[in-house]
């Protein structure tokens, strides 16, 4: 099973989203549930292209929340690098 870790910038992203998007008090718990799948299936996310390659992305507890991560295969560690709003023109999945 892969170990899932959050980077400091990702935690900052999530904290900022909680405030700017008026997310509910249980947001961190919801995100934690969304991350569980990565323990067993670390490559489940779609691989990103361009400047975000070779990162991967899955959806968070809301369809608009992107969870950007990398999988370090030798150590079997998933590192969450960012949380983003998919509706933003600056999102990793934006055209």
What is the predicted function of each stretch?
Residues 1-32:
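Arg/Lys-rich, positively charged N-terminal/basic patches that mediate binding to nucleic acids
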Residues 33-60:
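A short, surface-exposed loop/turn module that caps and links secondary-structure elements
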Residues 5, 56, 79:
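Amphipathic alpha-helical recognition patches that constitute DNA-binding helices
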Residues 60-95:
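Enriched for short, Lys/Arg-rich terminal
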Residues 25-27, 53, 84:
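Short alpha-helical segments used as structural interaction elements across diverse proteins
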């Amino acid at each position: 099973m892969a170990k899932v870790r959050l980077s400091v910038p990702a935690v900052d992203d999530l904290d900022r989203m909680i405030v700017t998007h008026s997310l509910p008090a249980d947001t961190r718990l919801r995100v934690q549930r969304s991350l569980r799948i990565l323990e067993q299936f670390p490559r489940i996310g779609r691989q990103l292209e361009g400047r975000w390659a070779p990162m991967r992305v899955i959806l968070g507890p809301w369809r608009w929340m992107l969870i950007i991560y990398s999988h370090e295969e030798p150590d079997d560690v998933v590192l969450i690098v960012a949380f983003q709003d998919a509706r933003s023109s600056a999102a990793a999945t934006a055209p």
